[in-house]
Each structure stands twice: as C-alpha cells, then as structure tokens.
Amino acid sequence: MPLSNMPASGEPQREQAEILDALLTMPAGVAAVTAPRGRGKSALAGMLLSGIQGSAVVTAPAKGATDVIARFAGEHFHFMAPDALLASTTEADWLIVDEAAAIPGPLLEKLASRFPRVLLTTTVQGYEGTGRGFLLKFCARFSGLRRYTLSTPVRWAAGCPLERTVANALLFDDALIDRKPAGEVRLTSLEPGIWESDPTRGTGVYELLCAAHYRTSPLDLRRMMDAPGQHFAVAQAGAEIAGALWLVEEGGLPPELSRAVWAGFRRPRGNLVAQSLAAHGGSPLAATLKGRRVSRIAVHPHRQREGIGQRLIRSASGEDYLSVSFGYTDELWRFWRQCGFVLVRMGSHREASSGCYTAMALLPLSEAGHQLCEQAHQRLCRDMRVLSAWNGEKIPVTDSWEATLNSDDWLELAGFAFAHRAFSTSVAALTRLLLAVDMPLPALRGKMEGNMHDFGRKALLAKLREETAYALERLDYPRSQQLKADIMQWQFFQ
C-alpha cells in the first residue's frame, strides 16, 4: 500500500507521505528536506528509516536532537556522531544527516560521498535553523540534488497567529536571500542606536547573519541591540545589505588574572580567544592585550567571491589584534589566511558535532599584537610535529621542530608540574623533556606510547605531574624551585 494512501492514525500526513514515497523509490543520490520548526521533518526521517529495506546510519551535531527520529525509527535507529562516522569504515544503504546545516560543507561532502543514498534535513526560519542560505551554500555542492519542503504545521494549526507573532518579533523571515544586492558596495559602521533610528537596516544585518550562520539565535539579536563591547561593519549595496561583520571586544585582563588563567587556576567567563592565548599559549600575560574577536561574518550569497569579506576585515580596527576561532577546514582557512590572519592554535581533538578541530588565528594590529602573534605562531611551528602526530591531523604551518629544551619549555613544564596546565597544551614540551633526560618516568613514557591503561584519568594526570616535577628537579633543582615558587604565587591576587 503506498504511503500516500495510509490512514491518518499517527502516520504520515499528506506532505510527508508524498515525500516518503519519493524517497523510498529514490535511486542513488542526495535529497534534502527543509522546513520551519513544527512541520514533522524529524518524524519524516524516522518514518523513512522504519520503511527502508536496507541498513542506515543517522548523524547529527548532537544525539539529543535526534530523539524524534529515534522514536519513529524504532529498532532501525543507529546513531554515530559526525567525528566518529568520519573516522570509521561504516557502510550502509542510507545516511540520514539531521540539521545538516550545522556540519561544515567539506565534511558533509566527505560523509555523503561514502553512502549510496543520503538524506539531509535542516530547519529553516527559526532559532534552530540557518535560513535558505543552507540550500544556496551547502546543497549547491551536490549535483542532481532532490529538494523537498514541508510547509504544513503538525504541532499546531496552519496559520497559527502565535507562530506569526513570534516569527515577526524574532525576525525569522529570510526573504532577504531572494533579493540580490545590486550596485557598488560601500562600507559603514552600525551602532546600537540603529534599532531606533533605522530598524530596517538593523533587521537586514541580523537576517543576513541568520541566513549564513547556523543557530544565530534571539540571544544574538539581544546582544546586537544592547550588549557592551559589540562592533559592526556593514557592506551596503544601495538599500540592501551585501555583507556584515560582527566583532566582540576581548582581553584587557589584569596581569594577575592573566597569569592565573595561564596556570590553570582561573577560568573566568567570556574572552574566548584571549583566554585561550594564555591558557594554551606560552605567554602568561597574553590575556592582558586587547583584541576584537570575529563573532560572525557573512556575505550575501549573490555577492560572494567579490572580496567583500576581506574588505570588511580590512575596515575593522582593534586595540592590539583581531582574532577568530573556527572549525578548521581548508576552505575556511584559505579565507582567513587571505585576510591576513596567522594561525596560532589548533585544538587537541575533533569536535564531535562538526568533526573539525578548533583553530584560532590572529591579525596583529599593534606592536604588542605583532609580538604576541609571532610568539604564538613560532610556538605552534616548533610544536607542530608532535601535535600533528598526537592529533592525527597535519597542521598547516612550517615544521620548525627543536628537540632541545629552552626557557619557554621550562616555564611550560613547570606550569604542568606545579600548577594546572593541560597535558594537551604541554605535550610537545613533555616530549622534549623525555628526550633530554635518562630517567625511567614510566607514566610519562607510557602515556606518550599510548600504553597507560591501568590508571584512572585523574590518577594518571596526577602521576604525570609528579614525574614531570621529579624530572625538572633532577635536571636543575634551583631553577625548578624558583619557577615553582613564582607560579604558585599566581593563584593569589586581588
């Protein structure tokens, strides 16, 4: 019995049934289902799983978001996180990617190429979604894409006035994607007062950010309106918005707090990149510098590849540097490198939601910013060989490996031994330490060789710190004790 003829007893509604019939008879290829919230998109994916004859795997940025799919799929539901799926050799007849817009395009391509049939689903026009920018940006990667849309609500009545009120209040409209901003582009700044003096312009910027960035939320809208330390640059083409840049002030921490962050004694809220420069970098005073982090940057799909994004970056100003934190892909890094950014950090593990390592980069603006950027980049180059081997991912910087311990290594090792520096941050210095000493250090050597399975995580970390302290004291007792005394003072400040 065709699904389109099934009775209305918790089974597919007409729109869902028509799409299900098409999917169940689909030859090899990629299909995409987009819908606003409440249209039964996840239920449809679960029904597809329960109806197919072969095997299937489901992936999504978060497993919790697939509960509806699991409920409809029953025993046919098999979930793997994007990073785990990428690293596996799993084969199946179908791949279901829920909220596909949250997964970087290059990773989405890699995953889709491994399965004969792929269904991409994503929410549009809502705080969980990314607008029709998903179809323009991601689905253009797949030739012969079959596109389907659900428009009839299943959680509430069609034409619900509350849904329209919420959509209007939270600027869920994405009609801006249909309009091409034509003409010469000029760059201007956007001040918070724009929401009173010219709300249409502020709305245009927010709608562009929603279309370009997954999960731009009403909280972001509130921040745009009244949060301190926010700066906006806009690329205007006539009356239309062609591009937008959102910067957030960071850094400027007191020296005492910056040192405590470096040592792992403190983790105050906010200051994403500024704190990371201290906590994962080599300078205890890194977080004292002032910078502006790129929170969002977007260019209208019809005006991309014209250099507008680079112009927005060049127009930006900051105290010491501009910074950016992003899920690393070759494509994204190519853009940031063209803007003049320098890679200063690569995360130690893939994010389960995106399958990407977190990368951080700086664009120095002041002399102090140049010094910090050069120091952080040189550290990354010097450690690159060890970090790449440990992560299993090549870091796109010059290999400047040195096996000899230097003063930066001594400070790093003391921070690990006598404070709370992370193992992943200190792993290159620890590798050089093992090359420099002729001592057993069984926990350290076993950890490096991947053979330490007899310890719990906390117990092993304590043992690693203990052995590092012992090695430093054997190498140079006065030096190790002076560093220990200095670092221990950094946990006390006004």
Where are these regions (language model features)?
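Conserved RecA-like ASCE P-loop NTPase motor core of nucleic-acid helicases/translocases
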Residues: G54-T66
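Terminal substrate-recognition subdomain of acyl/acetyltransferases
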Residues: M1-L3, P82-L86, A92-W94, P106-L107, ...
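Conserved acetyl-CoA-binding loop-helix of GNAT-fold acetyltransferases
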Residues: S42-M47, R296-G318
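Pre-Walker A (Motif I) flank of P-loop NTPase domains
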Residues: M26-A31, Q230-H231
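Conserved beta-strand in the GNAT
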Residues: A239-E249, A278, R293, A298
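N-terminal pre-P-loop "Q-motif" helix
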Residues: A8-P27
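Conserved beta-hairpin
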Residues: G229-V248, P255
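Walker A/P-loop nucleotide-binding motif
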Residues: A31-A43
